[in-house]
């Protein structure tokens, strides 16, 4: 009986040591510790700033850092990529809106807007694997993140927009989340979440289970679409993010969450990236393989 008591006590002590950190956008600052400000349009005032102070958005006492305009080139103040913050409470098709009209806490509350630059990811020589990554202060185990459709992207998926055509039930738009090391290299497994698949679109905040990922120094975010042209993806590559949770210990969420949250598995077969979902295989562009 005493042995059982001491075993349970030791197990409880180990469990109690685990610490979870959830993204808190109210703590967001620049590199110098100054609080992030929003302009009259309810977006981060420094969204188009290439100043070094805004290369990362620091949250949770710098335990979670979001990349912003990592290339340092805003093309004269008219371009941005990576992550920015928004408090927009509308859903009109704007790039800084999400279909939920706000973060997890409700309409008008802050959320993260991501814009993935395929051009930067494929051509940069800065040592970063993507325009969109979240860096941790040390190695953590990812637990979960909430993803929501961008209003601008949903408009394109439904109606077409500029060079982007409307989606059919054969099209897919996927967000690929992968762990990174301290050298910003992608390592280990990936989680693939579909913003559009089988004629269905993300219509609000959905939890994505990240517990299959190993301990890492951060996360990279990439996007793929079946609508591509000579210059790459035609579909607007925006997405919204909130509620990222990381832990000092491995999180076991159970097999029942795999189908609903992970959505798909990424595998490398004969040098080709394949995505497996519901017994089907897709290539990296999201095309169904027979």
Residue positions per predicted region:
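Positively charged n-region of N-terminal signal peptides that target proteins for export
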Residues: 1-4, 18-19
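Sec-dependent N-terminal signal peptides
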Residues: 4-13
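N-terminal targeting leaders for non-cytosolic proteins
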Residues: 19-130, 137
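Terminal, low-complexity interaction segments
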Residues: 25-27, 172-251
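Extended extracellular/luminal ectodomain segments enriched in beta-structured repeat modules
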Residues: 137-144, 215-216
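Short coil-to-beta strand junction motifs in C2/discoidin
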Residues: 156-175
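Residue-level detector of functionally pivotal "anchor" positions at catalytic/ligand-binding pockets or at interdomain
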Residues: 248-275
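Short, glycine-anchored, charge-dense loop/turn motifs used at functional sites
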Residues: 282-287
């Amino acid at each position: 009986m005493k042995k059982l008591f001491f075993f349970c006590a030791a197990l409880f002590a180990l469990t109690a040591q685990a610490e979870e950190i959830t993204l808190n956008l109210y703590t967001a600052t620049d590199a110098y510790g100054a609080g992030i400000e929003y302009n009259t349009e309810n977006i981060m005032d420094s969204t188009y700033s290439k100043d070094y102070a805004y290369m990362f958005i620091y949250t949770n006492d710098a335990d979670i850092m979001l990349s912003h305009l990592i290339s340092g080139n805003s093309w004269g103040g008219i371009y941005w990529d990576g992550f920015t913050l928004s408090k927009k409470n509308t859903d009109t098709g704007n790039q800084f809106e999400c279909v939920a009209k706000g973060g997890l806490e409700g309409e008008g509350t802050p959320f993260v807007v991501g814009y993935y630059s395929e051009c930067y990811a494929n051509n940069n020589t800065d040592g970063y694997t993507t325009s969109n990554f979240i860096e941790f202060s040390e190695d953590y185990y990812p637990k979960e993140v909430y993803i929501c459709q961008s209003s601008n992207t949903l408009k394109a998926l439904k109606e077409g927009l500029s060079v982007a055509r409307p989606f059919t039930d054969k099209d897919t738009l996927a967000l690929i989340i992968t762990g990174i090391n301290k050298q910003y290299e992608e390592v280990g497994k990936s989680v693939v979440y579909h913003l559009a698949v089988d004629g269905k679109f993300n219509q609000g905040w959905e939890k994505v289970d990240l517990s299959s990922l190993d301990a890492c120094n951060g996360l990279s975010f990439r996007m793929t679409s079946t609508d591509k042209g000579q210059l790459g993806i035609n579909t607007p590559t925006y997405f919204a993010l909130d509620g990222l949770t990381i832990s000092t210990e491995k999180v076991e969420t159970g097999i029942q969450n795999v189908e609903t949250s992970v959505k798909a598995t990424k595998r490398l077969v004969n040098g080709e990236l394949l995505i497996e979902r519901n017994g089907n295989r897709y290539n990296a562009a999201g095309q169904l393989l027979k």
